[in-house]
């Protein structure tokens, strides 16, 4: 049998039986999707690959907990979202500590976000990164990863109505963040 014809459930059973090639196939099948989700959550940076690897390590270590109640892609995406949220928390803590150190040493804080980069993708990505994690996760899953409302609700363990309202709020916030950019380009 060719690897791409084997179902996810068959791969999981093979992994449980010690087949390392089945695990490699799961990684190959879902790595780009998982990295895209992580990148949408934390931005394009060196940590994306590290967190992506951690997703598959966590999956492997918890393989016996996977009951197949949701698709494997949903399960892996949930792990990716959780690890991304952990990274966001770590960054906020690091930033808070560095700001406290700067203030205690009497240094000046300068605004480094006022760059002159006209790359649309980067501008949009920066705007997405400004969203709070709860809005960003819904936006990334629905609009970037193209999950349905129901799939997004399952991944985030939220009611579908909450997904829809967060998506609407995320889009409003994103529009607010991007409005100055588009106004400057319309002139």
Task: Provide a role label for each language-model segment.
Residues 2-5, 14, 43, 96-100, ...:
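C-terminal edge and immediately downstream basic/flexible tail or linker adjoining helix-turn-helix-like DNA-binding
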Residues 27-45, 62, 128, 177-180:
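Amphipathic, Lys/Arg- and hydrophobic-enriched alpha-helical face
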């Amino acid at each position: 049998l060719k690897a791409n014809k084997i179902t996810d459930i068959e791969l999981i059973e093979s992994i449980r039986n010690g087949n390392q090639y089945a695990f490699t196939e799961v990684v190959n099948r879902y790595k780009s999707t998982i990295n895209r989700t992580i990148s949408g959550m934390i931005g394009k940076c060196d940590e994306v690959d590290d967190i992506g690897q951690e997703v598959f390590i966590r999956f492997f270590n918890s393989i016996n907990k996977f009951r197949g109640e949701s698709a494997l892609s949903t399960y892996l995406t949930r792990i990716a979202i959780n690890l991304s949220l952990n990274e966001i928390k770590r960054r906020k803590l690091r930033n808070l500590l560095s700001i406290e150190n700067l203030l205690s040493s009497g240094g000046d804080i300068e605004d480094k976000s006022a760059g002159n980069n006209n790359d649309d993708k980067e501008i949009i990505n920066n705007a997405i990164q400004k969203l709070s994690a709860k809005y960003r996760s819904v936006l990334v899953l629905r609009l970037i990863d193209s999950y349905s409302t129901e799939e997004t609700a399952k991944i985030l363990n939220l009611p579908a109505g909450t997904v829809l309202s967060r998506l609407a709020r995320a889009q409003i916030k994103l529009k607010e963040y991007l409005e100055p950019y588009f106004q400057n380009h319309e002139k």
